[in-house]
Regions:
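Gly-rich Lys/Arg/Thr-decorated short loops/hinges at beta-loop-alpha junctions or inter-strand turns
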Residues: 8-22, 38-43, 62-71, 98, ...
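Glycine-rich phosphate/diphosphate-binding loops that line cofactor/substrate pockets in enzymes
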Residues: 8, 31-43, 90-95, 177-179
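Flexible, low-complexity linker and terminal segments
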Residues: 2-31, 161-241
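Thiamine diphosphate
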Residues: 52-179, 190
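Proline-rich low-complexity regions
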Residues: 50-53, 156, 184, 230
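Metallocofactor- and cofactor-centric catalytic cores in central/energy metabolism, strongly enriched
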Residues: 14-63, 69-83
């Protein structure tokens, strides 16, 4: 607050839009369409570190905590990008869908250690990394692209056209691709993609089968093959070649 005025943006209208169901028309920003698409995909947990142009994804979910609790979606504003990336470790042993977000390229550099381990081991549940790609836009310090990081770690990189229907479909397909290939997927969003206005036909949100309100019955058995450590890493590296 500043001189008694609350300077925080309210996402009350956007939160109501997240509740739209089958056949309803969603109208709003690209980044909020991504948020809606996550819920339609049955995401179980979302984490991240705020940074332009993807900040609103986490902001609206934090303000929608009551609705997230109702769906069973765990939302966490992380201390940095590395701790956000580490959250995706939940999808290594369990068939749960998770998404994390931050600004690239500096944020991706911070998360690189966790991302390398995640990409080596692979995932069971769909894992989506939503990148605020700001190359050439003028609000980033470092002018580098995320492509090199995705290439070195064998992470799929999706670059949706700035159209809300395409963006939403890309989120859905990214989870399917991640689960089919057992590999995390990056989706890069530029500033125009995040803030363009548009509309799409919504679908019902899906409550995750495993969530904060519907916890797993048994702990996953210990599997040394799912640890990024020799000799497991040799087999993991070989499996990446055959994706």
């Amino acid at each position: 607050k500043l001189y008694g005025i609350n300077m925080e943006r309210s996402f009350k209208k956007e939160i109501e839009a997240l509740k739209l169901g089958d056949g309803d028309i969603f109208e709003g920003e690209g980044i909020l369409a991504v948020t809606k698409a996550l819920l339609q995909s049955g995401v179980a947990y979302v984490g991240g570190y705020q940074g332009s142009p993807v900040s609103n994804l986490l902001d609206v979910m934090v303000q929608a905590k009551d609705y997230m609790k109702e769906l069973g979606v765990h939302v966490e504003a992380c201390a940095n990008e590395s701790s956000a990336a580490a959250m995706l470790g939940a999808s290594i042993n369990y068939p749960v869908r998770g998404a994390v977000t931050w600004k690239s390229i500096v944020g991706t550099n911070v998360a690189s250690d966790a991302l390398s381990h995640l990409a080596s081991v692979g995932v069971l549940g769909g894992s989506l990394i939503i990148i605020g790609e700001d190359y050439g836009e003028g609000s980033s310090i470092i002018q580098e692209r995320t492509h090199g990081v995705a290439l070195k770690s064998t992470i799929w990189l999706m670059d949706p056209r700035p159209n809300l229907e395409v963006i939403v479909r890309t989120v859905h397909k990214a989870f399917e691709l991640s689960e089919y290939s057992h590999t995390p997927v990056m989706m890069q969003l530029r500033i125009r993609t995040c803030h363009l206005q548009g509309k799409f036909i919504a679908k019902n949100n899906i409550k995750p089968k495993i969530s904060s309100t519907n916890k797993v019955g048994e702990v996953a058995p210990h599997n040394y093959d799912l640890i990024a450590h020799p000799p497991s890493t040799y087999a993991q590296e070989l499996s990446l070649i055959h994706i």
